[in-house]
């Protein structure tokens, strides 16, 4: 299979068409680095943070706040910011570029949650195309990094017309790539993602277009690339359950296997994927304790790390045939050691059997 990224992402640095979506509570350093282990040798793709509030970033400790913790070996990090005021945005992007090591800045204009809407962040910016473009301009005034924007769909024919006008305004203001989740704010995760809007946006707007929505397998990713002609595909929760999708796509494209997996083939059957998920789930848990060390972080508690891991299982577990049972057992863990014993016993204990991974699950919760 072939796919060429003909419009530059991160000014040409990106050569791989699959990327992780920024997700609250999920795209933190521990999960991010565990997923990165499946990236093929030679592949370059952007890596997100959780959503970062531009009002808080100027005063936050980057070595203490969980949303901005990073590993020194990470590269091509693109933090996603929420914001609509120039001074907080100015201070935030300067710190992210000069102190944190960002490779780009992503502006969230697609988040439909009430907390973002109450501050006129996220998808609420799509209610005012002129001001949304100004948010991009004010960001561009204070950073030399490439700027991307994540947005949602318009509703109906008039909504599509608005989406195109809105998107062109963002590009004129300085956005170098756009990611479209083709569901409206009202839909949230319900209904079917309208991939046709991705195709039309790619035809009408002259920058890299990244598609997002209803991708659960590498086959889905290939179908989106083919049907919409988008430059790349952004995958959310499915990549937290099936991170070797990166490996599968890389294998299809002729990339070498990930570091440490030389000579191996990407898991493809449900049983192979189930076994790989077991390894991955334990890796995520181990990385939580490595990158979020409780003893060194005064306001980090063991209970918080346990909640983070349970949240990972809640989002990734639905693809596992008995993921509900794993989640239930994890909910009874009273310490990190207890949690590690529980997860290890579930997958590799004397009563354990291979837990297959299903191809798809209902994502509309």
Show the residue positions of the predicted features.
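Short, solvent-exposed helix-helix connector turns and helix-capping sites enriched
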Residues: 60-64, 128-129, 242, 335
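Active-site beta-loop-alpha junctions enriched in small/polar residues
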Residues: 23-25, 52-54, 82-84, 110-112, ...
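Hydrophobic faces of well-ordered beta-strands that scaffold small-molecule active sites
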Residues: 18-22, 47-50, 77-81, 105, ...
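Alpha/beta enzyme core
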Residues: 34-39, 90-121, 129-207, 223
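Alpha/beta catalytic cores of nucleotide-metabolism and tRNA/nucleoside-modifying enzymes
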Residues: 1-10, 14, 18-19, 134, ...
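Glycine-rich, positively charged N-terminal anion/phosphate-binding segment
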Residues: 2-8, 23-102
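Short, electropositive, low-hydrophobicity segments enriched in small/polar residues
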Residues: 29, 87, 114, 126, ...
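Short glycine-enriched, charge-decorated loop/helix-capping segments at active-site entrances
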Residues: 64-66, 120-126
